[in-house]
Amino acid sequence: MLSGFANGTIWLIAIAMFLSRAVIKTGLGKRIALYFVGRFGKKMMGVAYGMALADVVIGPGIPSASARGGGIMYPIMQSIADAYESKPGPTARRAGAFLAIAVSQIDTIICTMFLTAMAGNPLIAELAKSQGVEITWMTWFLGAIVPGIVSLIVLPYFVYLIY
């Protein structure tokens, strides 16, 4: 009944959740994101790439897509959209719709790039281990880095073409 608590993966997820809450509460994630947006945010494409870089930096340490995307990236994206006077309705296409789609898709890419970027990834590694396949953080990263970087480069441009 309590055998699940003996699984190290469950404890890794629990501790990472506590750390992600600390990053949100202290505002560290927000400061990291605003740093990258400030460096690259001269145009809307730069803002999207800045948000992507911020997500790459905080992604390995926050194993929850909802905590990272909804707790850190979304409020920043919303503030940027407000600064461009982009609100739901007729002005949504000014910045808000583009940023909302780009940030949510970027968060999905980050979840696949790092073993610790999503709570389910360590469970996948544990399942693979039970079948005799060892997946370490580095093997996951090396397998996902090239498609992840290509996706992060292409995605904002593709979304920009649509909007």
List each model region and its residues:
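Membrane-embedded alpha-helical segments and adjacent helix-loop junctions characteristic
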Residues: 1-88
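Juxtamembrane and boundary regions of transmembrane helices in multi-pass small-molecule transporters
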Residues: 65-69, 84-163
